[in-house]
Amino acid sequence: MTVTESAAAPSPVDRGEPLLRADELVAGYIPGVNILNGCNLDLYPGELVGIIGPNGAGKSTLLKAIFGLVHVRTGSVTLGGEDITNLKANDLVARGVGCVPQNNNVFPSLSVEENLQMGGFLKPGKFAERLDFIIDLFPNLKDRRGQRAGSLSGGERQMVAMGRALMMDPKVLLLDEPSAGLSPVRQDETFIRTRKINRAGVSIIIVEQNARRALQICDRGYVLDQGRNAYTATGRELMHDPKVIELYLGTLAADEIAPED
């Protein structure tokens, strides 16, 4: 199985205003200790943006700050021009922002369909419509709708977590290391799945330790280091930047993930 590089994304000038903007974010978990130190990010409509960098760079903290799970001390987050800084996760879901955390957070004693229902309160007709959409994205779940989530494989649990985040038809989806803990084959499937969701009209920010794979599918990438922006460019440009390769990627593998029609 191979992953092809995405074509260079249209420049931000061609895309109008950002759908989501994080501006000069300063945030942390302990009083007086900052993990983010003036971090910036723009996500344009229809874009797939990757965030990479070394451990402790602030990648996951940036997603948590956007999704209201870490308090932003200074700076702002806007969605469609509306200030959403430090709003609670439920309020962000209502505004069209979904999030899949690292640990997936599926409910093992509930069925797949019951887990998907936890994504939001929908009328029966709307739930059925969204369920059809999610099963189309994740056909492996079709015959497992009544199966308890605790009996699923890691890759299948991740599908459930993604499906639950998509249940409310978000404009923006935040993915925190979706390939973590998966086999190489399942990782490749995850990146194909992520691109498929993006092609269905969802703008995505993906944080990844598997930097090479993330850059192969993303339109643009941000390299974070010590809570700051170190590099920003298209995924292709970052993959071929000698300094980025030396500091963050190592020797690039020749294998690629083939696009899924």
Language model: regions and residue ranges:
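Glycine-rich phosphate-binding loops of nucleotide-dependent enzymes
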Residues: T2-D261
